[in-house]
């Protein structure tokens, strides 16, 4: 099914309001497995709207008109649609009663003939009741094309769509199901390159890659009549993706850290810490508490996070974490030594199961001979301490700091998963 959205209102064309309805409707229709092919905006002009309707009727199976259902002279959507279809406007009984009730309880409001328009629908249409306003919507199919009229205000349109329109549309259509895979440790360009054959040959399910700061997302989507059917199809595609190797021989399966739109590396670590009954602390230099703040974002953080340290200067690193100042001066703050000593010191002082440390060069200037984006991340548990070096090049200062925390969370995640495998 090809769908088209028509926003009616001169105020949209002049930029006075933003057409947020288009985004909302497109998302809702996609969830139903209905493909939106066109977004159109037209002013409050009958001739131009008739022209748009003529074009839409020839290229779309579902035409949804938003706006122009109110009581003013320029609210002409229903009148124009009726004229286009060669039908009359009739009164909907329930909408008329709602109009009567509205004015009966507001004696100071003047009821003009224009107000009656809000209770009218196109002859033969099924009314879509307005749960938060007065203007009734409607849905009608003529010569194989389904036309829908909806109010313009989002506060009226959204409830009408969710509670009136969607049930009317879902009777005969499959639903779009999606699964979101989240990757860390592979860039979008490489990921797209190594699964190019899957993307090029996709029909159903489909693959859509998205890049976020420091990570990549793949949305797998399929049309199905049930969740079970969708899962079977998506499982096959996911396994094909997981079995693919990166350019340096890593398995993509090892780079998938989780699922879902709102998931994050921070949450995965928080979840695993709670699952295994472990605690964590952190000592942060260049990230200045970002790692700890991310952990504390989740309700119940006190179960896994006792407290931590922000040690920006060399002197504070020495004083707060019991690291000999002479050793810090010898190795420099941007080093494996400092990252490991910070992680160990924080872990011991808080008696936590894991200590994480971040030290490096946020930029834009170099430090101790290290270019901007050079970061050392230390991790200590009750048995050992180690560190990694990453170079986050070509990024802003804020991006370097944020991506550094992602590397730190991934390091903890891997350690927790290894502990799980050893149980």
From Swiss-Prot:
Pfam families: CinA (PF02464), CinA_KH (PF18146), MoCF_biosynth (PF00994). Belongs to the CinA family. HAMAP family: CinA_B (MF_00226_B). This is Putative competence-damage inducible protein. The gene is cinA.
